[in-house]
Amino acid sequence: MSHLFPFRQIGDFQITALSDGTMSASLDLLSGIEKADAGVIQNDAGLDEPADIHINCYLIRGRGRVILVDAGAGPLSNKGGQLNVNLAAVGISPDEVDTVLLTHCHPDHIGGLLDPEKRPVFQRAQIMLHPLEAQHWLDDKKLSMANERGQRNFGLVRQTLHAYARNLRFFDGDNIAEGILPVWLPGHTPGHTGFRIDADDKCLLIWGDIVHYPHIQSAHPNVSILFDTDPAQAEETRKKIMEKAVSKKMLIAGMHLGLAGFASIFREGSGYRLSYSEN
């Protein structure tokens, strides 16, 4: 297996962080912190583009399985859409992926499921998501209440789920494969889901979009982002899972953790600190 990208070995599974690139954003999207204070944190972290949000996908290989967690932004982002190139770099073609696990259905997570002609990219894969996620995006009442951008997102989700209708499956709380368990992490979206991989004394949690700006939201877990469907629930979930990650000494992976892909989390003051070197 290629080691061009950050990876961790948990039992029989090798988990590789594959960058999809970045998406342009703004610190104005954050609530619960002054923009200037958020900027200081980003600058102190040495980030060249402090408002950009990095996008990761994760490849899980082992026990005869090739599982992808999220599909990135695909052609929807002029600074993203690098997943397929990076899959090829580690020797994986889209047809070799047997399962795509979706943390949720925002465009930077499902955009890579369809090619520019709106055809399925992963034609042999099962697509798995939380049933509450599908219910949310297929709810006509919620669609009618959404703003223009939101309605475009609803349209994208519906188009994507329809394209994969024959291969669509829902989590039922059981292991996806022995040692891989879905973890419901609601708030960012109703069906937002992480994936826990356990083996021996090691535990890795791919926590999806618990944070978008990791340095800011670990130090200040009360900070929410405009993309959160239920900011209060997202904050509650973030605090709970960060505390659990500390107490259980989990290794963390996340779609917006940055190029390093993996981090450990520690308590610090009234919040937490992510370390990319101590894992």
What are these regions (language model features)?
Residues 4-90, 194-208:
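Conserved beta-strand hairpin/beta-sheet module of binuclear metal-dependent hydrolase folds
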Residues 20-21, 71-74, 105, 133, ...:
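Active-site metal-binding loops of divalent metal-dependent hydrolases
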Residues 81, 88-89, 123-184, 233-249:
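Metallo-beta-lactamase
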Residues 67-69, 101, 127, 204-206, ...:
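Residue-level marker for buried hydrophobic side chains located in beta-strands
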